[in-house]
């Protein structure tokens, strides 16, 4: 048996080619995006991390008995969407995260969902998005009710979940797998559509800036060369990292993640 993130796969016998899915995690600084990403990849909870660190991680998953090569971009926007092309033209699906104990993060999630809706209109395609209320373990300090989350998700026609990165792994895994299912449905509808990968130096079709038409700061749809390169992460910063697991060795011992620089894992 060979083991990678996700379920173990047999080392012999014919294997169908894995579905490739790119998933971007969006949200305000402090909403718990990195904690959710690491929880999904390692079953562990992190208590400290660098909010300025942005990376893309690779995981081999099995969703509905189908192998999936999942790439997860843990974005590093601070308070509002910034330089959005790096994920809008890359991801097949999006997780928009807010913290149930932060009204500001909830308001920011509305901005991200609006951005995705505008991009869907611009590109004339459906963009799968899931709204995620994180830090359910902090429910006693709630500033956002579950009903408000349901209403916001309903407004944009997306799925809604409440979870906690520091509690059950299964709930976090379920959300990520639901994102894969949503992406898979859209890919099956238009299999020839391929997103622009971060490392490709290819210009996008010229369009008028969204800033001028919709007032979304720093989010434009011009060519990649027009983006403020000081704010956009370099290819080296937004590298694809494959992290292997020792999960097969022990069901009780969580795998060790060694390539997440800036994280403190417990």
Swiss-Prot record:
InterPro entries: P-loop_NTPase, Ras-related_GTPase, Small_GTP-bd, Small_GTPase. CDD domains: RERG_RasL11_like. GO terms for cellular component: plasma membrane. SUPFAM superfamilies: P-loop containing nucleoside triphosphate hydrolases (SSF52540). Keywords: GTP-binding, Hydrolase, Nucleotide-binding. Signal peptide: none annotated. PROSITE patterns: RAS. It comes from the Eukaryota. NCBIfam families: small_GTP (TIGR00231). This is Ras-like protein family member 12.
